[in-house]
């Protein structure tokens, strides 16, 4: 639903410019996204507990900036992280959700913290979801099967009655492995 690249890469480009970095924003973005997954998987596999989505995004950004030898200050990173509060939905996502709302329950199942998800739903997506489920109640990140089992129990549905629709293949793989139907968009 949310356009992370479209929302964050302009701000990331500004950060790189402010730091005098010569790195291409697309290169840094791709590496940062890969590092985010590694950080989430480490939390899951090493049973480190749920660090929290925004904490993982920050930790992976710091790792990426250091890897690319970008000279930055903590205040610059703090300023950049505020962009996560201003994520924009894809142009067609809201219209699609509005069309679906009349015929099925809309449930947000996300790696983000619950309060953060409520903020995004109310202020950025501006759609009323029937349920907002955060992985923080499970203590694992998607695609851990426990996340999908928890959501099915909370919704009082069998996994086969649910469909995960996502723009990330790992969401679909985890959902399907847990008995959900999945659709990659």
Task: Please provide the spans of the model-predicted regions.
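Substrate-recognition element of Asp-dependent hydrolases with the DxDx(T/V) motif
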Residues: 75-123, 132-135
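Short acidic capping loops at alpha-helix termini that bridge into adjacent secondary structure
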Residues: 73, 127-131, 159-162
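Structural signature of beta-strand start/N-cap positions in the alpha/beta core
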Residues: 105-107, 130, 161, 181
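Short loop-to-alpha-helix "cap/lid" segments that border enzyme active sites
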Residues: 142-156, 173
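A short, structured active-site edge motif that brings together acidic residues
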Residues: 29, 33, 128-139
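Acidic, Mg2+-coordinating phosphoryl-transfer loop and its flanking beta/alpha structural elements
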Residues: 160-185
């Amino acid at each position: 639903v949310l356009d992370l690249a479209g929302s964050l890469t302009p701000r990331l480009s500004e950060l790189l410019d402010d730091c005098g970095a010569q790195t291409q924003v697309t290169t840094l973005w791709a590496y940062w996204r890969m590092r985010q997954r590694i950080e989430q998987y480490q939390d899951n596999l090493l049973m480190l507990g749920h660090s929290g989505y925004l904490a993982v995004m920050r930790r992976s950004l710091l790792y990426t900036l250091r890897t690319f030898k970008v000279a930055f200050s903590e205040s610059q990173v703090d300023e950049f992280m505020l962009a996560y509060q201003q994520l924009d939905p894809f142009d067609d996502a809201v219209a699609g959700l509005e069309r679906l709302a009349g015929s099925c329950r809309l449930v947000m199942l996300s790696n983000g913290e619950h309060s953060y998800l409520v903020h995004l739903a109310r202020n950025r997506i501006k759609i009323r979801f029937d349920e907002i489920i955060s992985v923080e109640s499970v203590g694992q990140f998607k695609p851990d099967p426990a996340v999908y089992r928890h959501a099915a129990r909370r919704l009082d549905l069998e996994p086969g009655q649910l469909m995960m629709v996502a723009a990330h293949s790992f969401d679909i793989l985890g959902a399907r492995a847990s008995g959900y139907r999945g659709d990659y968009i």
